[in-house]
Amino acid sequence: MQKTKEKRAILITGCSSGIGYHVAVELDKLGYQVIASARKMQDVQKLQKLGLNSVQLDLDDTESIRNAFQQTLEISGGSLYALFNNGAYGQPGAVEDLSRETLRAQLETNLLGWHELTTLVLPVMREKSEGRVIYNSSIPVSYTHLRAHETNDLI
């Protein structure tokens, strides 16, 4: 189900659960044209059943990022008021226990995926002389030792 009413369009990444899911639902209630993205198709379908516009977006995959961006423009009529970069993941384990490859994979998603999507979105926002790019990062409140995903907050 696609909502076509003219509203401020917001693309939100990582809407399968947690903050992304709740932000998408609440902004939709407030009247924004939400495009909720998720990596897995089953999550996209779950979001669509709620009445949200939803696209599949895997931040590790350039083709997926580009396809989701194009679908977002089709849904929104070519404009985008905001990008809410929320989709990410944390690799469990103590920093000293994680390999370079594991951390590289995490940075690929949590930094480079966001960057690639943002570089696609900015020209659309500049054309309209308005827009917002929001980066969200969260970590659990307490840990007994530093986890790899906590290092993202140090960057």
Model-derived features: positions:
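Conserved NAD(P)H cofactor-binding loop of Rossmann-fold oxidoreductase domains
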Residues: N86-Q91
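Conserved glycine-rich cofactor-binding loop
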Residues: S16-S17
